[in-house]
Amino acid sequence: MKFTLISSCVTLALMTLSIEAAPSGKKVNIPLTKNKDYKPNAKNAIQKAIAKYHRHRSVSSSNSTSTDGIGYVPVTDYYNDIEYYGEVTVGTPGVTLKLDFDTGSSDLWFASSLCTNCGSSQTKYNPNESSTYARDGRTWSISYGDGSSASGILGTDTVILGGLTIRHQTIELARREASQFQSGPSDGLLGLGFDSITTVRGVKTPVDNLISQGLISNPVFGVYLGKESNGGGGEYIFGGYDSSKFKGSLTTIPVDNSNGWYGITVRGTSIGGSRVSSSFDAILDTGTSLLVLPNDVASSVAEAYGASDNYDGTFSISCDTSSFEPLVFTIGSSTFEVPADSLVYEQDGYSCIAGFGYGDYDFAIFGDVFLKNNYVVFNPEVPHVQIAPIA
């Protein structure tokens, strides 16, 4: 699959305030916090990413109210930057759920009291206890290529995202979920992709409603994923971005959203000044842990770092990365790095697994290994992203 990118350039005025927003100042911040209990598994992360995009390729067709219109949501950093979640409040009175914020999908679903097999540690939303809940009558079901799945019913309710109150948001209440979801530290998923890939067609995403209900006046959200070496955590800012979190100016990149994703073109890859790949397409996906590359690109990168193929989508790599040059991608008119300290994803004794791997596609998935080193502002209304190295 190849993306056909928008040919016209999108030009945005860059402002210098610490927290940037539209003139009316409406935005919401969601901070990220840290969870040290999660353990990484590179093979599972690769399989999850492959299964996720296999599914979409097969498809046709705080509780207080924010007054300034800025949504700030902190997110928790699972063990060593593996995955991140933010807290969202649903219902009246509200129940706080830990959700995986995912730019690679578009559904808002979570464990509910109707679920017959949801994880015992998951917080479960009870529609019978919310005065603002309304039944929808439709059902939903998600099946992934690795055999995992979830299903349930649709409804609507009030959703508070970083202090901004979304009315009549469509929610997906899980009645059943596979064991892969039961054992995770999150209660569900909040999709930040485009509405063309919602499981039930015609459903408005939370970002759609933030814009249409006038809760944010600047149709963007800024993503900062903290690194464990800097204390972990991170934040999502809906309606703006935090210019203190990145260095220099933002580079504007056109997006191809024809498949419902934030698709960009990577012009090339280099290591230590030597070019190791030509151009390829990539998806910016906060819901994927690793940097998943096309097979040929991954092989060239692995060779440059002396990594060996494990033939399961992962590479074994030296645990001592002190002599490694950064992995550099040319995107638009700028270059963006994955530094040496991010090239190791998983360590087990003296053996290490690389933060990059490969899938079965001719495009890349730029997951958290890339995103925790580069600040990204997503604009779904005039589809483009803006990227800058983290400060």
Swiss-Prot record:
User: Which residues does the record annotate as propeptide?
Assistant: 22-68
InterPro entries per UniProt: Aspartic_peptidase_A1 (IPR001461), Aspartic_peptidase_AS (IPR001969), PEPTIDASE_A1 (IPR033121), Peptidase_aspartic_dom_sf (IPR021109)
* Stretches of the chain forming a coiled coil according to its record: none
State the superkingdom: Eukaryota
The EC number(s) this enzyme carries: 3.4.23.21
* Catalytic residues (positions): D102, D285
Report the GO molecular function annotations: aspartic-type endopeptidase activity
According to the UniProt entry, where is the signal peptide? 1-21
Cystine pairs: C115-C118, C319-C352
**Reactions catalysed according to its record:** Hydrolysis of proteins with broad specificity similar to that of pepsin A, preferring hydrophobic residues at P1 and P1'. Clots milk and activates trypsinogen. Does not cleave 4-Gln-|-His-5, but does cleave 10-His-|-Leu-11 and 12-Val-|-Glu-13 in B chain of insulin
Q: Which GO terms describe its biological process?
A: proteolysis
EC primary class: hydrolase
* Sorted UniProt keywords: Aspartyl protease, Disulfide bond, Hydrolase, Protease, Signal, Zymogen
The answer to whether UniProt assigns keyword Isomerase to this entry is: no
Domain Peptidase A1 as annotated: residue spans: 84-388
Q: Which protein family is it in?
A: Belongs to the peptidase A1 family.
Q: What is this protein called?
A: Rhizopuspepsin-3
Q: Per the UniProt entry, what species is this protein from, by scientific name?
A: Rhizopus niveus
**Source organism lineage?**
Eukaryota, Fungi, Fungi incertae sedis, Mucoromycota, Mucoromycotina
